[in-house]
């Protein structure tokens, strides 16, 4: 099954997969939680500032492409989940790698192993490479190895759910220096804490809404 997504659909699908694997206790996601996940600053490249209406349109697109649905048991507050596993029979390892590529774009084997750890453990780089090979061998292929950039020692891999990446743009992107990488790592840790607080606040707000609706039945 060929899938072609736009940039917002890529972000929404990546977030649905990530949260299923990393925080299953909060999955499926409400629209509020999904929008927060799409806009978080950690583990995202590029960082986005999407409105809920944009996320709704992306969800509609994913539904039409048969990769996401509204959960049947979502209750009073609608919740959403992806259905890639049902349609394409992905393993957890394949989903973790695919989610990381959807959320952060092209990455090396080492980057994928480290960053996907929160979703699925990989014993070594060979395990990551094996999963990438399996995704590349599907019909149609879901990932590809990019030509190595000048100044980089390792090749990177990209997903193909939005079509082939613009290689001319890739060539213009210089690798970040060591100090910049350190700052980026620190920013990610801070952003991760901010996201956790925002997620908890969203869940509390939703619980309050449900309680108020329940209480109103007896007034």
Curated annotation (Swiss-Prot):
Source organism superkingdom: Bacteria
InterPro entries linked: DUF480, WH-like_DNA-bd_sf, WH_DNA-bd_sf
Similarity field: Belongs to the UPF0502 family.
Name assigned to this protein: UPF0502 protein GSU0233
Organism: Geobacter sulfurreducens (strain ATCC 51573 / DSM 12127 / PCA)
């Amino acid at each position: 099954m060929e899938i072609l997504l736009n940039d917002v659909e890529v972000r929404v699908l990546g977030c649905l997969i990530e949260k299923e694997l990393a925080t299953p206790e909060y999955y499926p996601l409400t629209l509020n939680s999904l929008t927060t996940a799409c806009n978080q600053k950690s583990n995202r490249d590029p960082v986005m500032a999407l409105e809920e209406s944009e996320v709704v349109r992306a969800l509609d697109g994913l539904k039409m492409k048969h990769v996401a649905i509204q959960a049947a048991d979502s209750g009073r507050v609608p919740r959403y989940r992806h259905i890639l596993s049902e349609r394409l029979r992905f393993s957890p390892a394949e989903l973790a790698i695919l989610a990381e590529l959807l959320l952060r774009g092209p990455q090396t084997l080492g980057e994928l192993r480290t960053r996907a750890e929160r979703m699925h453990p990989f014993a070594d780089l060979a395990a990551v490479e094996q999963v990438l090979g399996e995704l590349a061998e599907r019909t149609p292929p879901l990932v590809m190895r990019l030509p190595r950039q000048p100044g980089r020692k390792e090749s990177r891999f990209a997903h193909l759910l939005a079509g082939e990446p613009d290689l001319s743009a890739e060539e213009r992107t210089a690798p970040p220096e060591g100090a910049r990488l350190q700052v980026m790592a620190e920013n990610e840790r801070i952003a991760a804490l901010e996201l956790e607080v925002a997620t908890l606040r969203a869940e509390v707000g939703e619980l309050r809404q449900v309680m108020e609706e329940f209480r109103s039945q007896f007034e």
